């Protein structure tokens, strides 16, 4: 496969520049006959989750296609689902560059992107043009300049706009790169947010005559007692699923490596065991009451199987896709 050569060229570039170059090419082929250049045939492995049928259990995690610009090209590679975003009500530039760093030896990434995106209206226009036949998840967040105590309003604005076009909606309250965002995972703040989201979901179900499931994306840095409280809140508010996990602030597995002390969330292989353990604890606590989408350091069939064995119904990749490329999709879907 050609990807090792592509990767070698891309890894000569700054990580964000490499992403821009890749997306320039993908934008050229998405929705055109040139999609055949990136198309991969993968076997059907249907899975039902959150009331939806996924053609296979492997999805692309949020963060790669923040604005939904390359949905069809990415879909052609064989993903059963694609999660676009995180998107916010208004466009925002994100944090200052440089803001993403490769830990090549560890096959990890540290990012402090800060929800850079073109805004929810732009994303919706892109989604309208897409023809992806898998499940499209839309991951939503709050603007950086929205006070945390008013954060719920941003989620409800985004829900209203993406609801007609989403297969499911992911609520990102676990990015470490938006000040105060992770506080929404705790206690009354979480209950208030989930209550508002559930009410809005039922209101939009009536309006559009279709039910779009909602999943909450959580951090891997929650303590066991905090995880129990989160699980309890998700069940009480009849949330449809949980995505475990986002990036970690923990650097214990990358000490001494170049860029290890950069501020931001760590993803990739160093997150693998930590996220799997969160899934295992969450699964024991939920006891089948709502499904788990497993993400964090999946870079092989074995790593994907470990997430499923720990209790995940579906899995997603991001950093593994950067390091291994499209062949990883085919490998996981074929052998999982």
Curated annotation (Swiss-Prot):
Q: How does it sit in the membrane?
A: Peripheral membrane protein
Among the GO molecular function terms of this UniProt record, one is: dihydroorotate dehydrogenase (quinone) activity
Where it mainly occurs, coarsely classed, is membrane
The entry marks the following residues as binding substrate, namely 66, 111-115, 172, 177, 246-247
The record's InterPro entries line, in alphabetical order, gives: Aldolase_TIM (IPR013785), DHO_dehydrogenase (IPR050074), Dihydroorotate_DH_1_2 (IPR012135), Dihydroorotate_DH_2 (IPR005719), Dihydroorotate_DH_cat (IPR005720), Dihydroorotate_DH_CS (IPR001295)
Pathway the protein takes part in: Pyrimidine metabolism; UMP biosynthesis via de novo pathway; orotate from (S)-dihydroorotate (quinone route): step 1/1
Top class in the EC scheme: oxidoreductase
Cofactor (UniProt): FMN
Tell me the PROSITE patterns matching this sequence: DHODEHASE_1 (PS00911), DHODEHASE_2 (PS00912)
The protein's annotated catalytic reaction(s) are: (S)-dihydroorotate + a quinone = orotate + a quinol
GO terms, biological process: 'de novo' pyrimidine nucleobase biosynthetic process; 'de novo' UMP biosynthetic process
The EC number(s) attached to this protein equal 1.3.5.2
> Gene3D superfamilies of this UniProt entry?
Aldolase class I (3.20.20.70)
> Which Cys pairs are S-S linked?
none
Residues noted as binding FMN in the record, renumbered to the chain: 62-66, 86, 139, 172, 217, 245, 268, 297, 318-319
- Describe cofactor binding as the record notes it: Binds 1 FMN per subunit.
Q: Which UniProt keywords apply?
A: Cell membrane, Flavoprotein, FMN, Membrane, Oxidoreductase, Pyrimidine biosynthesis
| Gene Ontology cellular component terms for the protein in this record | cytoplasm; plasma membrane
Which residues does the entry assign to the active site, renumbered to this chain?
Answer: 175
Localization in the cell? Cell membrane
Q: Give the record's subunit note.
A: Monomer.
Query: What job does the chain carry out?
Result: Catalyzes the conversion of dihydroorotate to orotate with quinone as electron acceptor.
**What's the family?**
Belongs to the dihydroorotate dehydrogenase family. Type 2 subfamily.
Protein name (Swiss-Prot/TrEMBL): Dihydroorotate dehydrogenase (quinone)
Q: Which organism is it from?
A: Klebsiella pneumoniae subsp. pneumoniae (strain ATCC 700721 / MGH 78578)
